[in-house]
Amino acid sequence: MALLSFLFNSKPKTASAAKERLQIIIARERNGRAGPDFLPALHQELIAVISKYVKVNPDDIKISLNSQGNLEVLDVNVVLPDDAIEAVK
């Protein structure tokens, strides 16, 4: 009987196993994109726009993208020089 069960044992189909592996790979790639590609370009554009109006050090502009559950929060922090604040008043 062991011989018959060995010969006719239902093994998982290779197509379904390959599909499952591919789904796992795709899910990992999607989760691996924690740092979006657009952040460096956005940082450069913000430096250009802010520099039009206020003389600011590019290192004083910080951008971060945080995920909280199913929400993504884009945090932009710009440290303005003291003389720029005085000019606005």
UniProtKB/Swiss-Prot annotation:
Protein name: Cell division topological specificity factor
Keyword Acetylation in record: no
Pfam families: MinE (PF03776)
Organism domain of life: Bacteria
Gene: minE
Family the entry assigns: Belongs to the MinE family.
InterPro entries xrefs: MinE (IPR005527), MinE_sf (IPR036707)
UniProt record, GO biological process: cell division; regulation of division septum assembly
Family matches, as NCBIfam families: minE (TIGR01215), PRK00296.1 (NF001422), PRK13989.1 (NF010595)
Keywords: Cell cycle, Cell division
Entry function: Prevents the cell division inhibition by proteins MinC and MinD at internal division sites while permitting inhibition at polar sites. This ensures cell division at the proper site by restricting the formation of a division septum at the midpoint of the long axis of the cell.
